[in-house]
């Protein structure tokens, strides 16, 4: 962090957030501690201009539950042509200005704050939001990172949480999410968030957020100095089982107040049991963290689901260190056993990152399901992630 920003932070931790913001600054900033209490954070909205290729999807958002369910029945049929048919409409352009919710957290300890040189860009998974990274006291990756001398920027993806919710089919697609993440990485690189300048930027993703982060290293290999990917593998064989467990519904039919304003096409899980089935392994998770995640459940769209595979390709030009972290019993991407028939972390590393540096690592979180952050082994996973960065001089 540059010295002038550090001095301003000591006088008023959020002075630099509320003065001299350009068009890329955080608007209406709100300051406060992290959920775990170990970080000092500012959150607010940032407007990003997006212009990226998309796909003209031949699909309209289903208006009732029978139509939602039938879409997934047809998508996962053994000889399905659903995805091919829907994505046959040709290219489109996704363009516009969108408000994205961000949360920048820094160490509360002034001595640690003075040493901050690296920021981690945290990208959550599908049906989650930025709170995944700071889910509960004792299960906050944000706080672990702060204690180790790192800044973090978490955010709500386009169409999620406090960010804008444009057309869930034609706009909220995977390429748009990549464009948002790329833009945020650029702002961090160029000291355009509150004037804070960081020497290094690390991309950290979970689940679909790992897919987006991996997509960044393929399309924009200079965005990140290192990446940490959790809840991911080279196989999507168990995704249909996950979708069945979710029993996705139009979010505006869910009683949760955060969904009442949404149009059809934004989908969420029907029940807490479905979330547990897909994301958790009993009795190895913290029940308070589980309840918090259920309370903060978010949305996904078929716009993303139908286009996510299009951004997946080996990151042949990314030469930085890569860390792949999975729960031992991840259902979504490992079918419940990430060590069967071989270590799926090592497979993913070799396929997606053939040019990664020798400092790359993998880690299996003992007894954890997909949502590693909320499991009892979560703190050990966080410790490993920080050690990986330190081992690589970041």
Q: What are the functions of these language-model segments?
A:
Residues 25-115:
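N-terminal cap/lid segment of alpha/beta-hydrolase-fold proteins
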Residues 318, 324-326:
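Short beta-strand/loop motif that positions the catalytic acidic residue
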Residues 193-207:
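Alpha/beta-hydrolase fold nucleophile elbow
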Residues 170-195:
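Alpha/beta-hydrolase active-site loop
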Residues 109-153:
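Short, surface-exposed "cap/lid" segments of acyl-processing enzymes
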Residues 214-299:
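Alpha/beta-hydrolase-fold enzymes
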Residues 358-394:
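Catalytic active-site module of serine/aspartate enzymes centered on a nucleophile-bearing elbow/loop
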Residues 156-171, 370-371:
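Glycine-rich "HGGG/HGxG" loop immediately N-terminal to the catalytic nucleophile
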């Amino acid at each position: 962090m540059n010295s002038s920003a550090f001095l301003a932070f000591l006088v008023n931790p959020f002075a630099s957030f509320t003065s001299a913001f350009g068009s890329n600054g955080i608007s209406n900033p709100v300051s406060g501690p992290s959920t775990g209490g170990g970080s000092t954070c500012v959150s607010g909205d940032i407007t990003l201009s997006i212009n990226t290729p998309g796909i003209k999807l031949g699909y309209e958002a289903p208006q009732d539950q029978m139509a939602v369910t039938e879409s997934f029945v047809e998508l996962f049929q053994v000889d399905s042509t659903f995805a091919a048919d829907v994505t046959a409409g040709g290219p489109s352009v996704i363009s516009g200005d969108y408000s994205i919710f961000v949360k920048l957290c820094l160490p509360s300890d002034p001595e640690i704050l003075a040493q901050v040189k690296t920021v981690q860009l945290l990208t959550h998974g599908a049906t989650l939001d930025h709170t995944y990274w700071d889910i509960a006291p004792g299960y906050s990756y944000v706080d672990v990172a702060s204690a180790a001398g790192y800044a973090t920027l978490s955010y709500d993806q386009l169409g999620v949480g406090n960010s804008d919710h444009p057309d869930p089919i034609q706009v909220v697609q995977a390429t748009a999410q990549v464009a948002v993440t790329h833009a945020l990485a650029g702002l961090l690189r160029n000291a355009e968030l509150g004037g804070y300048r960081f020497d290094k930027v690390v991309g950290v993703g979970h689940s679909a957020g790992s897919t987006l982060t991996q997509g960044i290293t393929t399309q924009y290999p200079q965005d990140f100095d290192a990446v940490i990917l959790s809840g991911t593998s080279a196989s999507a064989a168990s995704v249909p089982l996950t979708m069945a467990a979710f029993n996705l519904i139009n979010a505006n039919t869910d009683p949760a107040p955060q969904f009442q304003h949404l149009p059809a096409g934004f989908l969420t899980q029907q029940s807490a049991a479905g979330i547990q089935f897909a994301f958790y392994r009993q009795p190895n998770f913290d029940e308070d963290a589980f309840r918090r995640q259920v309370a903060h459940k978010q949305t996904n769209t078929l716009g993303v689901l139908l286009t996510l595979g299009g951004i997946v390709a080996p990151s042949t030009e990314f030469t930085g260190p890569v860390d792949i972290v999975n729960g031992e019993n991840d259902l979504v991407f490992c079918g419940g056993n990430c060590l069967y028939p071989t270590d799926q972390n090592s497979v993913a590393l070799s396929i997606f990152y053939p040019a990664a540096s020798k400092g790359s690592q993998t880690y299996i979180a003992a007894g954890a399901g997909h949502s590693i952050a909320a499991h009892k082994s979560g703190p050990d996973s966080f410790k490993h992630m920080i050690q990986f960065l330190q081992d690589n001089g970041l």
